[in-house]
């Protein structure tokens, strides 16, 4: 029997992205893509960070992150600036407008979390998170070692 886990992971990801788009819209954040929502949530956790750190926190590649940040700057949600100590490093921080959407982002992601874990026990959720974290580590390690 063929392992269908990759198909299932991909399906959950794509449906989750569509649901998140709808939830962001419902909470007044219709201009944001799911990736931009992830960027905001990461910056709510740790503001004024390097683009490299933000890429690590969101698992977005640098080109996707750069395009998303450009759009978010146009929306007035974030601003980029050079690092005072190392001019090669670009930093990102929330604007007042970006900070004002914190509650709406939290509510949208909480709704999505509730949908995802509906019918899943806390024990199952814990096991799932441990396995998912291991899968993440496995693919991250392979990506760092640059499979060609």
Please provide the spans of the model-predicted regions.
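N-terminal leader segment of winged-helix/HTH proteins
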Residues: 1-30
């Amino acid at each position: 029997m063929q392992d269908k886990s990759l198909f299932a992971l991909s399906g959950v990801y794509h449906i989750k992205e569509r649901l998140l788009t709808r939830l962001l819209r419902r909470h007044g954040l219709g201009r944001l893509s799911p990736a931009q929502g992830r960027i905001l949530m990461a910056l709510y956790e740790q503001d004024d960070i390097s683009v490299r750190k933000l890429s690590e926190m969101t698992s977005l590649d640098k080109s996707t992150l750069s395009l998303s940040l450009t759009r978010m700057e146009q929306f007035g949600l974030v601003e980029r600036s050079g690092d005072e100590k190392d001019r090669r490093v670009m930093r990102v921080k929330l604007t007042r407008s970006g900070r004002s959407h914190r509650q709406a982002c939290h509510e949208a992601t909480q709704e999505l979390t509730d949908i995802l874990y509906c019918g899943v026990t806390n024990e199952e959720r814990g096991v799932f998170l441990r396995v998912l974290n291991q899968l993440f580590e496995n693919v991250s390690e392979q990506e760092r070692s640059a499979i060609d």
